[in-house]
Amino acid sequence: MAKYTGPSCRLCRREGGKLFLKGEKCFSDKCPVSIRAYAPGQHGQRRGRVSEYGGQLREKQKIRRIYGVLEGQFRRYFQRASQARGVTGELLLRFLELRLDNVAYRLGFGASRAEARQVVRHGHILVNGRRVDIPSYQVRAGDVVSVAEAARTHIRIAASVEATAGRGFPEWVSMDTTELKATIKAVPVREDMAPDLNEQVVVELYSK
């Protein structure tokens, strides 16, 4: 599946809720989902009945778009989760949550996951003191994630960290906003992740 390059806000409206793809705009009154809470297009306000398969597909697309991964990547995460010991749906979300680009976003090193991914790719993020520029890199409990010295003066990073601090950092990280450094205290459990995601229907979709 090709990468989507259209307006991000249309994806949020298509999925019927905020996917937090546009940084601070998503938390403001200017968010299109708050203004027009219906699907885009001529017939967007007339949502038809959705079949069981259609509902499963929509939830899969929603999760995939939130974390910004392509279909092939998403399926590989599911296969890995289904082969591991534990609850498949929860493991799937955990693998996505522990991607380096998502961790960078959770720490405020990017205003959105797309921006955090760019920060990672540009080599501005260190893991245990070593530069890592792979967005899909899996962070582990005990890892220390920080901003490289040369990037600590970037205004956008500083502003994003401040905004994220105001909303609160995840319980599974210990963040030092002065040093722009965080320790991963533990892997996130289901209660630490978005409560409005229904990962079980994705498991059912891929299990057919």
From Swiss-Prot:
Which Pfam families does UniProt cross-reference here? Ribosomal_S4 (PF00163), S4 (PF01479)
InterPro entries found in the cross-reference section = Ribosomal_uS4, Ribosomal_uS4_bac-type, Ribosomal_uS4_N, S4_RNA-bd, S4_RNA-bd_sf
Kindly list the biological process annotations in GO that this record carries. ribosomal small subunit biogenesis; translation
Q: Please indicate if the UniProt record lists Membrane as a keyword.
A: no
Query: What are the annotated GO cellular component locations?
Result: small ribosomal subunit
Protein family membership? Belongs to the universal ribosomal protein uS4 family.
Q: Which PANTHER family match?
A: 30S 40S RIBOSOMAL PROTEIN (PTHR11831), SMALL RIBOSOMAL SUBUNIT PROTEIN US4M (PTHR11831:SF4)
Q: Which residues form the S4 RNA-binding domain?
A: 98-159
- Summarize the subunit comment: Part of the 30S ribosomal subunit. Contacts protein S5. The interaction surface between S4 and S5 is involved in control of translational fidelity.
Q: Which SUPFAM superfamilies does the protein's record reference?
A: Alpha-L RNA-binding motif
GN (gene name): rpsD
* Role description: One of the primary rRNA binding proteins, it binds directly to 16S rRNA where it nucleates assembly of the body of the 30S subunit. With S5 and S12 plays an important role in translational accuracy.
Q: What is this protein called?
A: Small ribosomal subunit protein uS4
Task: Mention one GO molecular function.
Answer: structural constituent of ribosome
Is-annotated flag, keyword S-adenosyl-L-methionine?
A: no
Entry keywords, A to Z: Ribonucleoprotein, Ribosomal protein, RNA-binding, rRNA-binding
Q: Which organism was this protein described from?
A: Acidithiobacillus ferrooxidans (strain ATCC 23270 / DSM 14882 / CIP 104768 / NCIMB 8455) (Ferrobacillus ferrooxidans (strain ATCC 23270))
